[in-house]
Regions:
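Short, aromatic- and glycine-rich surface loops/edge beta-strands on solvent-exposed regions
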Residues: 60, 91-105
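Exposed beta-strand-loop-beta-strand "reactive/processing" segments of non-cytosolic proteins
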Residues: 84-88, 142-182, 190
Length: 192
């Protein structure tokens, strides 16, 4: 089943400045993504997200471990934010510097990891769903072939970490679980 993972978000970074509220995510994911039950080439990425921004024409530069990456941000109408996915050689550890570049100048923000020390691994989160939802997981196999792509995303809200574990069937249907990231307990489930 692990070979069917098309996205793992392993860390969340947050920060704000006078003009911007920003997040970044460490991810290993299929890129470009196609919801077809087959995991394509995976890339190591940092996803940048700037929320509540009145300017739509921005670039961003991220710096960590002595390496710099620059990209244009595009508007995402689902999250009402500016976003970019940057393919990187390695993922940031504890923090990164995000510089927002506009026609008015540059503004730097330190984004700090909000991943708690008691957060379980993404694979343990998947195994928790696998152990607690055996009938559902077994229904995803057809002749011993797993018929879904799996997304595992670390989420952070306030002082809490959660995992979103989603199973996409390639036909627009996603069954998802929200887990407490400290112990893998399923908090909620949703079947679209």
């Amino acid at each position: 089943m692990e070979q069917s993972i098309s996205q793992i978000r392993s860390d969340v970074f947050k920060g704000k400045s006078q003009n911007y509220t920003a997040e970044a995510y460490s991810e290993e994911k299929e890129f470009p993504f196609i919801n077809d039950c087959h995991v394509g080439d995976k890339k190591t990425c940092v996803v940048i997200k700037i929320k509540d921004c009145s300017t739509l024409n921005l670039n961003a530069k991220i710096v960590y471990s002595g390496v710099s990456y620059e990209t244009a941000l595009t508007y995402n109408n689902v999250s009402n934010s500016l976003t970019a996915t940057v393919i990187v050689s390695s993922l940031p550890k504890n923090s990164l510097t995000l510089t927002v570049i506009s026609q008015d100048g540059e503004e730097s923000i330190t984004l700090t990891s909000v991943k708690r020390s008691d957060t379980i691994s993404p694979i343990k989160a998947l195994k928790s769903v696998q152990n607690k939802e055996k009938d559902y997981i077994n229904s995803l196999y057809d002749n011993n072939v797993f018929k879904c792509e799996i997304y595992i995303r670390l989420l952070a809200e306030g002082d809490y970490n959660f995992y979103y574990v989603g199973f996409a069937n390639g036909e627009g249907k996603i069954t998802a679980y929200l887990l407490d990231a400290s112990d893998g307990k399923i908090i909620a489930g949703k079947n679209d």
